UniProtKB/Swiss-Prot annotation:
One of its GO terms (cellular component) is cytosol. This is Aromatic amino acid aminotransferase C56E4.03. Its main location: cytoplasm. It is an enzyme of class 2 (transferase). It is found in: Cytoplasm. It comes from the Eukaryota. It holds the Pfam family Aminotran_1_2. Coiled coil: none annotated.
Length: 474
């Protein structure tokens, strides 16, 4: 039998601890002990008769239609969301478009919870999920639930700017953990926490870690299972809550072999799941991980649907926050997504994830091959990522031909970026992702293989190489 999660209520913020359930959300769950239908005159729910959207139909790929050798190759199926239905396994518009609980539509939530069990199977009793409007919103809920103004939070040395901009206005100090090509260093995390001096830092010892473990944004690094175990052990040692932000989790890839092609690996769903690197959630015996999942990278970012998985304490407190803020994810999105997932089933969704994995592996290989071909090796260095959407590369500062101008790293990067845009290629400057600008002494750029057409990669990288050759000794 799985263990009970630890009582971690001492981690709750003042804001979270003071939240009460919305009475209007509570009354919506009222039931008669006489088992008679409740006629509701309580909540201000609009009558579905006045919803102008009467039915939604969507064309979706038939299972394995993305495989050229499949009998379904190129086939599209149609899924429908009716206004009403007597089928208990249908999410009708009368429900999807109505006010609902902060946890999200029950049918879609059940599907995603089962998906989470298949992939991660958290090893403690009572875990659950809450639907969110994506990981950015989920992070805001988690930060407000766990931190107070004046606290510090552990983050990777380079991190997602939107996450940092969620933290700083809440009065949080972001404490950078050193990184190498394989992600952040457990020994750096342990050193920071072991030697924490509240007077020097001006804040209490951190009790929250924010990390993007797989295909990290911006570096593309992926924590090994051994390093994840070390980090989890340190979280237990120092009583840390781990915010596991994993939008790129399913974009795990085989190693780059120096060519643009990629093998469309034939393996079963069971093999696919087994090959995924274990998550922090899967090793969380204490209930100290809040895992944030999103459909943004594997379905569509505009759907604004995600979910977080956690122990009962954090689920209940998160629900109290969601029900008076975001309330729930878009009903239109939930209706269409559930119709699609119901049509595919769990196995069909895993087939889709395998397809997405292969597609991004191919894209990564094409961009890396273009970089291998055009970027000056005397100036540029990079590690091929094994997950995610990004390649992070360093440009050797010592070879900058305008060193006499004493420009800062951000100034140099901004200059190179502006010249690149003039040449018709856009990319991200490394300083945008730096947590502590005081220790920013290297030139980095981040490129993504997610969006541009494959045939555009060579053109873009050749253009950028020209900019580098105009500014560095190549």
């Amino acid at each position: 039998m799985a263990a009970q999660p630890k009582d971690l209520s001492h981690h709750l913020s003042v804001e979270s601890a003071s939240r009460k359930q919305s009475p209007l959300k509570a009354v919506a769950l009222s039931k008669s002990s006489r088992n008679i239908k409740i006629i509701s005159l309580a909540g201000g729910l609009p009558n579905p008769e006045y919803f102008p959207i009467r039915e939604m139909d969507a064309e979706i790929p038939a299972i394995n239609s993305w495989k050229k050798d499949s009998s379904n190759s190129g086939k599209l199926d149609t899924v429908s969301v009716p206004m009403s239905s007597s089928d208990s396994d249908v999410l009708p518009l009368s429900v999807a478009l109505q006010y609902g609980q902060g946890s999200g539509a029950a049918l879609l939530s059940q599907f995603l919870k089962e998906h989470t069990r298949i992939i991660h199977n958290p090893p403690y009793e009572g875990w659950n999920i809450i639907m969110t409007t994506g990981n950015t919103s989920c992070l805001d809920i988690a930060l407000r639930m766990l931190t107070n103004r004046g606290d510090s939070i552990l983050v990777e040395k380079y991190s997602f700017p939107s996450a940092l901009q969620s933290m700083r206005p809440l009065g949080l100090s972001c404490i950078p953990i050193d990184m190498d090509q394989f992600g952040f260093l457990p020994e750096s995390m342990d050193d920071i926490l072991t030697n924490w001096d509240a007077t020097s830092y001006g804040s209490p010892k951190p009790h929250v870690l924010y990390t993007i473990p797989t295909g990290q944004n911006p570096t593309g690094s992926t924590l090994s299972v051994e390093r994840r175990k070390q980090i989890y052990t340190l979280a237990q040692k120092h009583d840390i809550i781990i915010l596991e932000d994993e939008p790129y989790y399913y974009l795990q890839m085989d190693a780059y072999e120096g060519k643009p092609e990629a093998a469309d690996k034939a393996f079963t769903n069971e093999q696919f799941v087994k090959e995924l690197i274990p998550s922090f959630l899967s090793m969380d015996v204490d209930g100290r991980v809040i895992r944030m999942d999103s459909l943004s990278k594997v379905v569509a970012p505009g759907s604004r649907v995600g979910w977080f998985t956690a122990q009962p304490l954090f689920i209940e407190r998160g629900l109290r926050a969601a029900e008076t803020a975001t309330q729930s994810a878009s009903g239109i999105s939930q209706g269409i997504l559930y119709a699609m997932f119901k049509h595919w089933g769990q196995d069909g969704y895993l087939e889709w994830l395998k397809h997405i994995r292969y597609s991004y592996t191919l894209r990564r290989n094409y961009l890396l091959y273009a970089m291998d071909t055009y970027l000056p090796k005397s100036v540029c260095s990079y590690i091929p990522p094994v997950a995610g959407m990004f390649i992070w590369f360093e440009v050797d500062k010592s070879r900058y031909i305008h060193a006499d101008k004493n420009e800062s790293i951000p100034e140099i990067e901004s200059k190179i970026h502006a010249e690149a845009v003039e040449e018709g290629v856009n990319l991200a400057c490394g300083n945008w992702f730096v947590v502590d600008p005081r220790v920013n002494d290297k030139i980095f750029f981040r490129v993504t293989f997610a969006h541009a057409e494959l045939e555009e990669f060579n053109v873009a990288i050749e253009r950028f190489a020209g900019v580098l050759k105009n500014n560095f000794k190549c």
